């Protein structure tokens, strides 16, 4: 019996270890964590965090032995249930056929863990790993390990992405469902045995599909470009899903904001002027540490397109393909309207269509972001007090006897008309007093639209809220208290532990960001119906010179040393992309200055994926005046002062 168990363990491990180290094709899906994505405009280093996580999180090591024990138990049970030896022989033949590839114990165990339970694939890498390039530690990862890890995870996540892009592939959809079931089931439940058998059978099916589906990979490579430029950071498909999860959250929230703003008057132009910059906000990993977030990641494939716009426009701190363009669309002042950004809230930073409009609705979030709270102008604060007083008056008005029936009917009619052009901040709704004068009152959290997992938001109080609507409604109720003043939207997604950013890590940002911005422009320039018209004639003329340059470094998982060498050698190719990104963010108002509210949407979307983003913004504001000028922005990216030109902002 022991001999059989040992053989089963060996076979299980062999199946778990990726047998092909070939890189993805140029058209492969440039997901957020894909380690090798030549075509992607994503920034490298996502895979390093898988290794770094093993080093920084000893708890993962403790999970490995338990995973092996679980597999032994599963194989023993499956053997007792008439699992024939011929199946074992098939697995062994499959192993021999795939090739003999050496993998260190740590890597093998990591792959095994991923295969045994897709419910915790995201726990294998650092939480900071996200849409933006990971830390420089990538250069220390063995290429074979990166390739193996990528391949192992790819075999797990391939069905997920395919199920979203090609619904008619039932086998992939089945695996998606099974992966979600495994997340909700406890390893000790008897159903684990059945899931293990199904996983092994699916793996056999996946390997041939993996090898013979270049067209799928090409479609996937294009799909993320359209729907999730933010998650186009290089990494495995699994990490990509997680990224998608987070990026999709702004989109979901933007829809909620739109609904809310429609109810509460969309014409708050006068109020927005009173609130100043904070109300005119401008506009991303990773790997959640909970099974719930794993599910979010898979569901996020559909919504990520919307998030990309928000992340990208906010600020290209974390090169996530195409995250730059519409990212800033994501968050804006309390206007709750969708006119704050010119790009969509989806992570498809380059799609100037429906997602483009949805991104604009996200602008209402930035007013409440970490920095937005501190930037409230005196006018904004006085308005808060005025609204608080209005709330009390509204309550008195509601408790007092109403006018005659005829007057009441006229009042309601006038009320509807008044609120139509009267906007309130997030967490408030418009109501009218008996005289028909509109004013804002706090929204009841229970009146918020039904929230999904992807709508979750983390507040600065380290509490996870069902949605941003619930968070701002709670903040409104706490107005006048210290807790209410401090409560802001920290980032999208459930709250998690975010490590501190080191000097070494933040120093690598400009390298990855410049390359990322350049690659995004290349993608926008290439013929694509969904991207058509995004760049104007002047922009296309500038980008064309870079696109046709034979010396251009193609998108891919490049080491920091190569990025640095290319920047020195082809410096002229990076000047315009930096100016273009600044112009994309500087929208509300377009005054050649970036405020925290204009950067906030990108930050909120990327904080859970890239922990250095906040510090990066601080580094770009050396005088600490909470404003980043074009000159400061250019210096932050290593552009020479003589090459910083406002004429390039078009």
From Swiss-Prot:
CDD domains cross-referenced by the UniProt entry? EFh_SPARC_like (cd16231)
Compositional bias (Acidic residues) at which positions?
A: 91-101, 189-210
Show the ranges annotated as biased composition (Polar residues). Answer: 116-126, 135-148, 157-174
Q: Which residue ranges are recorded for the region named Disordered?
A: 51-352, 375-415
In the record, what terms sit under GO molecular function?
A: calcium ion binding
May I ask which residue range the UniProt record assigns to the signal sequence?
Answer: 1-16
Q: Where is the Follistatin-like domain?
A: 418-440
* GO terms for biological process, alphabetical: signal transduction; synaptic membrane adhesion
What InterPro entries does the annotation carry?
Answer: EF-hand-dom_pair, EF_Hand_1_Ca_BS, EF_hand_dom, Fol_N, Follistatin/Osteonectin_EGF, Kazal_dom, Kazal_dom_sf, Osteonectin_CS
Phosphoserine PTM positions: 70, 78, 86, 155, 163, 272, 353, 406
The organism's place on the tree of life at top rank: Eukaryota
Protein family membership: Belongs to the SPARC family.
Name listed for the protein in its UniProt record: SPARC-like protein 1
**Name of encoding gene:** Sparcl1
């Amino acid at each position: 019996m022991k001999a059989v168990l040992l053989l089963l363990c060996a076979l299980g491990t062999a199946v778990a270890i990726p047998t092909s180290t070939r890189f993805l094709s140029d058209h492969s899906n440039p997901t957020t964590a894909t380690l090798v994505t030549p075509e992607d405009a994503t920034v490298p280093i996502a895979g390093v965090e898988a290794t770094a996580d093993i080093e920084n999180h000893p708890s993962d090591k403790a999970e490995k032995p338990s995973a092996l024990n679980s597999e032994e138990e599963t194989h023993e049970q499956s053997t007792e249930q008439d699992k024939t030896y011929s199946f074992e022989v098939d697995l062994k033949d499959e192993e021999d056929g795939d090739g003999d590839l050496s993998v260190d114990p740590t890597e093998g165990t990591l792959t095994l863990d991923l295969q045994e339970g897709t419910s915790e694939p995201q726990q294998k890498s650092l939480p900071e790993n996200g849409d933006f390039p990971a830390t420089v530690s990538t250069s220390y990862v063995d290429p074979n390990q990166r390739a193996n890890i990528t391949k192992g995870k790819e075999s797990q996540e391939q069905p997920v992405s395919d199920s979203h892009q090609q619904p008619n592939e039932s086998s992939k959809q089945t695996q998606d469902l099974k992966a979600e079931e495994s997340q909700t089931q406890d390893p000790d439940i008897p159903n684990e045995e059945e899931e293990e058998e199904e996983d092994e059978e699916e793996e056999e099916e996946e390997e041939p599909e993996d090898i013979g589906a270049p067209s799928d990979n090409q479609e996937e490579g294009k799909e993320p470009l359209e729907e999730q430029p933010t998650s186009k950071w290089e990494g495995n498909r699994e990490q990509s899903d997680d990224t998608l999860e987070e990026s999709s959250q702004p989109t979901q929230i933007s829809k909620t904001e739109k609904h809310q703003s429609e109810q509460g008057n969309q014409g708050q132009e006068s109020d927005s002027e009173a609130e100043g910059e904070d109300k005119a906000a401008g506009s991303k990993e990773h790997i959640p540490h909970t099974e719930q977030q794993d599910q979010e990641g898979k569901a996020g494939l559909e919504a990520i397109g919307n998030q990309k716009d928000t992340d990208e426009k906010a600020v290209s701190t974390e090169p996530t393909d195409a995250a730059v363009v519409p990212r800033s669309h994501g968050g804006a002042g309390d206007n709750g309207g969708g006119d704050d950004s010119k790009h969509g809230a989806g992570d498809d930073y380059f799609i100037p269509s429906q997602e483009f409009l949805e991104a604009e609705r996200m602008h209402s979030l930035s007013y409440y972001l970490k920095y937005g709270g501190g930037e409230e102008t005196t006018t904004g604060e006085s308005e808060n007090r005025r609204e608080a007083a209005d709330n009390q008056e509204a309550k008195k008005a509601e408790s007092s006897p109403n006018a005659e029936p005829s007057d009441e009917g006229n009042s309601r009619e006038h009320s509807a008309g008044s609120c139509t052009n009267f906007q309130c901040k997030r967490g408030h709704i418009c109501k009218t007093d008996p005289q028909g004068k509109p004013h804002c009152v706090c929204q009841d959290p229970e009146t918020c639209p039904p929230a999904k997992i992807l709508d979750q938001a983390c507040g600065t109080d380290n509490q996870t809220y069902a949605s941003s609507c619930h968070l701002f409604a709670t903040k409104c109720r706490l107005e006048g208290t210290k807790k209410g003043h401090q409560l802001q939207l920290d980032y999208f997604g459930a709250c998690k532990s975010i490590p501190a950013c080191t000097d070494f890590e933040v120093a690598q940002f400009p390298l990855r960001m410049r390359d990322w911005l350049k690659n995004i422009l290349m993608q926008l320039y290439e013929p694509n119906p969904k991207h058509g018209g995004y760049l104007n004639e002047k922009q296309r003329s500038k980008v064309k010179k870079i696109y046709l340059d034979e010396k251009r470094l193609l998108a891919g998982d490049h080491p920091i040393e190569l990025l640095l060498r290319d920047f020195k050698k082809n410096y002229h190719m990076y000047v315009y992309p930096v100016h273009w990104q600044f112009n994309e963010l500087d929208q509300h108002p377009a005054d050649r200055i970036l405020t925290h509210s204009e950067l906030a949407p990108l930050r909120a979307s990327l904080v859970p994926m890239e922990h250095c983003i906040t510090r990066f913004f601080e580094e770009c504001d050396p005088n600490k005046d909470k404003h980043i000028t074009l000159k400061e922005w250019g210096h932050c990216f290593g552009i020479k002062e003589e090459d910083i030109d406002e004429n390039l902002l078009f």
